[in-house]
Amino acid sequence: MTNKGQLLQDPFLNALRKEHVPVSIYLVNGIKLQGHIESFDQYVVLLRNTVTQMVYKHAISTVVPARAVNLSLESEAE
């Protein structure tokens, strides 16, 4: 994924991680996973509940936070 593609993704996932926001992650096959984002990189998200699961980003359809998240995007206009 290019840097432009991650201008929203990385700050969003990082805010969820830093603020320990509970999330529901829906996979492309319809399965719902719940937990807290522990870490992430270009390809995977580590989701923690009773255990830590490594979820591949290409399998994720939607990430739904349990509450609103404040994003601070420094370089919005490019």
From Swiss-Prot:
GO BP, one annotated term: regulation of RNA stability
Alphabetized PROSITE patterns for the sequence: SM
Record keywords: RNA-binding, Stress response
Signal peptide positions (record): none
MF GO annotations: RNA binding
The Sm domain, residue ranges: 10-69
Gene Ontology CC: cytosol
CDD domains, alphabetized: Hfq (cd01716)
Stated role: RNA chaperone that binds small regulatory RNA (sRNAs) and mRNAs to facilitate mRNA translational regulation in response to envelope stress, environmental stress and changes in metabolite concentrations. Also binds with high specificity to tRNAs.
Family of this protein: Belongs to the Hfq family.
Quaternary structure annotation from Swiss-Prot or TrEMBL: Homohexamer.
Protein name (database record): RNA-binding protein Hfq
Organism: Janthinobacterium sp. (strain Marseille) (Minibacterium massiliensis)
Gene: hfq
